[in-house]
Swiss-Prot record:
Residues that bind Zn(2+) 2: C173, C176, C199, C202
UniProt key word Cell membrane: no
Annotated organism of origin: Mycoplasmopsis pulmonis (strain UAB CTIP) (Mycoplasma pulmonis)
Recorded family membership: Belongs to the DnaJ family.
Keyword list, A-Z: Chaperone, Cytoplasm, DNA replication, Metal-binding, Repeat, Stress response, Zinc, Zinc-finger
UniProt zinc finger (CR-type) residues: 143-225
PROSITE patterns, A to Z: DNAJ_2, ZF_CR
Gene that this polypeptide is encoded by: dnaJ
Keyword Zinc: yes
Protein name (database record): Chaperone protein DnaJ
InterPro entries (UniProt xref): DnaJ (IPR012724), DnaJ_C (IPR002939), DnaJ_domain (IPR001623), HSP40/DnaJ_pept-bd (IPR008971), HSP_DnaJ_Cys-rich_dom (IPR001305), HSP_DnaJ_Cys-rich_dom_sf (IPR036410), J_dom_sf (IPR036869)
Matching CDD domains: DnaJ, DnaJ_C, DnaJ_zf
Domain remarks: The J domain is necessary and sufficient to stimulate DnaK ATPase activity. Zinc center 1 plays an important role in the autonomous, DnaK-independent chaperone activity of DnaJ. Zinc center 2 is essential for interaction with DnaK and for DnaJ activity.
Length: 377
């Protein structure tokens, strides 16, 4: 008998992979190899292999046994949780243990699984919504609270969320007998098979309402506009999302509302530039201040600061102000000013005075540099 391939290798993941990573890997492979989506002759066998690996690794109990005992545990009925049969992990010829390709595939991609809200009369959360907001650069430094009118769904108070005029108006669906789904024969690669589809009479709810609530018209929920405070955290990065729970679409069958994701966009500042959690700014310095070593005022997002200029400073030199950058939970950035020397506009009188004064200065900077360059052979 051929040795089974390692389940982690089949899904292309490490042993340290978490539940989310396992599911993501399965989804990708299922999209590629599912017989309904692939024309490859090997896709059917490959999909069996993928299903087997996912069925084990997605179950914490089965995964723990597999990690400790390997494939042999599959052939031992004494290992609880594997439901092992005489052919290893069940009869793959009929897909009895895994419900065929579709049992797991449809969990991800829709279809006849009970996980789908269209096919289930169980509580199901509403759809999540998204929107966006623009804030200034300084708002992203300090954070901001925005008051905004938002729509939120709540149970209709007139019918207590039943959608019916009265309790006596709620009947079990006569078509599906309360299941929310009906079975029909469909053509497949394996011939005609039974497929569970949403009951068209009750739309998967399992109930019929003879007289709808006059307030919500049978929707069970009503939409109200409320003033909501949205907290934008200090240090927010442009494109980052803020979550508001319960401000999405209405839940199904008593399920919770969906959520609202607010994507925050930060407008550019004409002078400040963000790099990671630091703030950079080109800072002009007059050569007069440089020569006289005068103190100058530096603007920061937290207020003005003073520094004393030294004649030893170089053009493009960076001076750091600790803790004056972005402040987030795990890190505090700095403000970094890049010195840019500038010559002020002197009046004619000042220029003459400077010329007279500087002519007496022994300035050999240019000559010294030329000599250094020419001395190199």
């Amino acid at each position: 008998m051929n040795k089974k391939e390692d389940y982690y290798k089949i899904l292309g993941i490490d042993k340290s992979a978490n539940e989310k990573e396992i599911k993501k890997a399965y989804r990708k492979l299922a999209m590629e190899h599912h017989p309904d989506r692939s024309s490859s002759k090997e896709s059917e066998a490959k999909m069996r292999e993928i299903n087997e690996a996912y069925e084990v690794l997605s179950n914490p109990e089965k995964k723990a046994i597999y990690d400790k005992y390997g494939h042999e545990a599959a052939n031992n009925p004494g290992f609880n949780g594997f439901n092992a049969g005489s052919a290893g992990f069940g009869n793959f010829g009929g897909f009895s243990n895994f419900g065929g390709f579709d049992s797991i595939f449809e969990e991800f991609f829709g279809g006849s699984r009970s996980h789908s809200k269209q096919n289930s009369n169980y509580p199901y959360p509403g759809e999540s919504y998204s929107t966006q907001v623009k804030i200034s650069f300084l708002d992203s430094v300090h954070g901001r609270v925005i008051s905004q009118k938002l729509d939120k769904y709540k149970d209709c108070e007139s019918c207590n969320g039943t959608g019916a005029r009265s309790k006596s108006d709620i009947k079990t669906c006569s078509t599906c007998n309360g299941r929310g789904s009906v079975e029909k024969l469909v053509n497949s690669l394996f011939g005609k098979i039974k497929q569970s589809v949403t009951c068209s009479t009750c739309n998967g709810l399992g109930q019929e309402i003879t007289h709808k609530c006059p307030s919500c018209k049978g929707a069970k929920k009503i939409k109200e506009s409320i003033s909501q405070k949205i907290s934008i955290p200090a240090g927010v990065i442009s494109g980052q999302e803020v979550l508001l729970r319960g401000f999405g679409g209405p839940g199904f069958n008593g399920g919770p509302n969906g959520d609202l994701y607010i994507r925050v966009y930060v407008t550019e500042h004409p002078y400040y530039q963000r790099i990671n959690d630091d703030i950079y700014v080109d800072f002009p310095i007059s050569i007069v201040n440089l020569i006289l070593e005068k103190p100058v005022v530096v603007p920061t997002p937290y207020g003005d600061e003073k520094i004393k200029i030294k004649s030893t400073f170089k053009n493009d030199q960076i001076i750091t102000f600790k803790g004056k950058g972005f402040k987030r939970k795990n890190r505090v950035g700095d403000l970094k000013i890049r010195l840019k020397f500038e010559i002020p506009n002197f009046s004619s009188k000042v220029k003459k005075n400077l010329e007279s004064l500087l002519s007496e200065t022994n300035d050999s900077i240019n000559e010294d540099f030329v000599k250094k360059v020419n001395s190199i052979k």
